[in-house]
Every structure is written in structure tokens, then in C-alpha cells.
């Protein structure tokens, strides 16, 4: 079944997150959050399952991509888009059905996906957009670790000068990811930098990372956490850097367990290297994570 799901995901331009749901309430919640879900329905599902000769398609359950949408009257509905192979063979169109209509044929199992966000290279003109994303993310991601006074005083243009300079001179590259027309995440990356984050001090074995690429920073608007956008950003720059460098590294705050789990899930491993830096009189520790080819 995973092979079939992968095939369908490719056809619809989405990627899977390997999250399984077990009931209609979970499915509805994921649809409301913008995911595409591939659900298993019974062979007697009455919307689009009947062949021209009157018989039903398939001998067992059928996998159906499910999108969230609304009817003209504003009532929540499921938008069903069948596998492309069915178009040619059975001339099956699309249907929008209500939860009540969908529920009797829903097997109770689905896997959620998300439409791929739009990525583009960032330029110096995007400095304010990037800075705004970073500032909003910092205020949520680092609350409780970075001093409140620093976070509360963080303005949306805090990083504008930095990004204007680095993106103009080419010392860093950057990418933005969009949800429709809205920039919701950004990543800065490039060759390994000689300086440490925030002018910090290295503790640990160190080592020669001059042949590595570096993900200098990656942040999302808080409402876009855990929706696949960060993964798409990271995988894009990681793969780009691996085309030139022996590996990729990044620094992550020791106490930021959400971020650490995210990087570990995508193949980065922690090292014994730490960077000690000071923000408003508080010493913070970043851990170096490395991804090898």
C-alpha cells in the first residue's frame, strides 16, 4: 500500500509525512490544516466507483485523495480527486461530498500529505520579509530560553541590514517558501563560515569543516510549524549543498528539542561541538549537527 501511496503522491505533486489517522475527526482536522489526505474507502463507495457497465471498481478497498473545501453554501465538504489512471479508463470526474456522505464508506484509515510549497531564491530585496519571519519565529521558538527582554524588543527589521549585506555580497544564499502568495519560511546557507554564531566561543573537539556547507539559519512563521514547510526548505538546501560539499552542518540551541528532533529526523546527527554565546547577559549553548554524504 505504501508503494501505491507513493505513486499517487507523485501524481498529485505532494509528499507524505508518514502520519496515519484512524478516524474521521482526525481526517477533518488535517484537511482544515491544509493537508491532502489519501483515504481508504470501501469498494461500494458510491461517488465515482461504478464502472460504465454497472459493476464496481476493485475487489477491495480503494485509495482516494481527499482535499478539504467548502460548498457554495459554506458547508464543509470533501473534494475527491481520483487517480489519473481512472480518467482514461472510466472517465471519472471530481466530486464534492459532505462529511455525512463520506463517513459510511470511509474505512477509518488514511495517510496525510501536503501540497508542495513554492520555493524561490531570495535576494537582497527580500531582506525585510526574511527578517520579519525570523523575528516572529524567535519570539515563539526561543521563549523561555532567550531572555524575554530581548525577545520582546525584537523588531521585524532586526536582521534587515544583515541580509541586505550578505545576500548582496554573496557570502550567504537564501531561499523563501510560500503558501500561495505569502512567504512563510526562510533559510540562509552557503559555504562553512569561519565565524561562530553570535560571535560565540567553540567548546569541544572542533575539527575541520572547511569542505562542508552550512545551513546558517532556518525559520518559519509559528503558525506554519509542523506542516512540512521546514522539511521542504531544509531538504532543498541540504541537497544543493551536497552537490558541492562533503557534508552539511548547522547549529541548534541545546534546549530547542523540537528543532533537534526535526534535524535528527532528516538525518543530521549531533556532535560534541558546542558554541557558547551571550544574549543579554545569558549564556546559551548551541550544538553542532552534521549530515554526511
Q: What are the residue ranges of the model-derived segments?
A:
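C-terminal "cap" of GNAT-fold acetyltransferases
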Residues: 175, 209-213, 246-260, 264-293
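Acetyl-CoA-dependent GNAT
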Residues: 121-127, 131-144, 149-223, 234-236, ...
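Short, solvent-exposed loop/turn segments that connect beta-strands within catalytic domains
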Residues: 71-77, 180-182, 280-282
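Short, high-confidence coil segments that cap the C-terminus of an alpha-helix
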Residues: 34-35, 172, 245
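Conserved glycine-rich acetyl-CoA-binding loop
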Residues: 217-235, 254-261, 265-266
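Cysteine-nucleophile protease catalytic domains, especially the papain-like/related folds used
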Residues: 1-21, 33, 111
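Noncatalytic regulatory segments and standalone regulatory/sensor domains
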Residues: 57-58, 67-117
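Active-site-adjacent substructure of cysteine-protease-like catalytic cores
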Residues: 20-81
Amino acid at each position: 500500500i505504501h508503494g501505491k501511496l507513493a505513486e499517487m503522491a507523485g501524481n498529485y505533486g505532494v509528499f507524505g509525512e508518514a502520519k496515519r489517522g484512524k478516524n474521521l475527526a482526525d481526517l477533518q482536522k488535517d484537511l482544515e490544516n491544509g493537508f491532502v489526505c489519501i483515504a481508504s474507502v470501501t469498494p461500494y463507495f458510491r461517488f465515482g466507483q461504478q464502472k460504465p457497465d454497472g459493476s464496481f471498481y476493485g475487489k477491495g478497498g480503494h485509495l482516494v485523495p481527499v482535499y478539504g473545501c467548502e460548498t457554495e453554501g459554506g458547508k464543509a465538504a470533501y473534494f475527491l480527486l481520483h487517480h489519473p489512471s481512472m480518467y482514461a479508463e472510466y472517465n471519472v470526474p471530481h466530486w464534492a461530498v459532505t462529511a455525512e456522505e463520506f463517513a459510511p464508506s470511509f474505512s477509518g484509515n488514511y495517510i496525510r500529505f501536503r501540497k508542495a510549497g513554492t520555493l524561490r531564491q531570495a535576494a537582497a530585496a527580500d531582506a525585510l520579509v526574511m527578517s520579519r519571519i525570523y523575528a516572529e519565529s524567535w519570539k515563539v521558538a526561543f521563549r523561555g530560553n532567550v531572555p524575554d527582554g530581548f525577545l520582546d524588543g525584537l523588531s521585524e527589521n532586526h536582521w534587515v541590514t544583515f541580509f541586505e549585506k550578505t545576500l548582496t555580497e554573496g557570502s550567504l544564499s537564501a531561499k523563501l517558501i510560500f503558501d500561495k502568495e505569502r512567504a512563510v519560511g526562510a533559510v540562509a546557507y552557503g559555504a562553512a563560515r569561519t565565524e561562530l554564531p553570535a560571535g560565540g566561543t567553540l567548546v569541544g573537539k572542533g575539527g575541520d569543516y572547511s569542505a562542508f556547507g552550512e545551513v546558517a539559519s532556518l525559520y518559519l512563521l509559528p503558525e506554519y510549524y509542523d506542516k512540512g514547510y521546514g522539511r521542504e526548505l531544509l531538504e532543498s538546501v541540504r541537497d544543493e549543498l551536497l552537490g558541492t560539499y562533503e557534508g552539511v552542518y548547522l547549529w541548534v540551541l541545546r534546549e530547542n528539542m523540537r528543532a533537534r528532533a526535526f534535524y535528527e529526523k532528516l538525518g543530521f546527527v549531533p556532535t560534541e561541538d558546542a558554541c557558547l554565546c551571550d544574549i543579554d547577559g545569558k549564556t546559551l549553548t548551541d550544538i553542532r549537527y552534521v549530515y554526511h554524504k
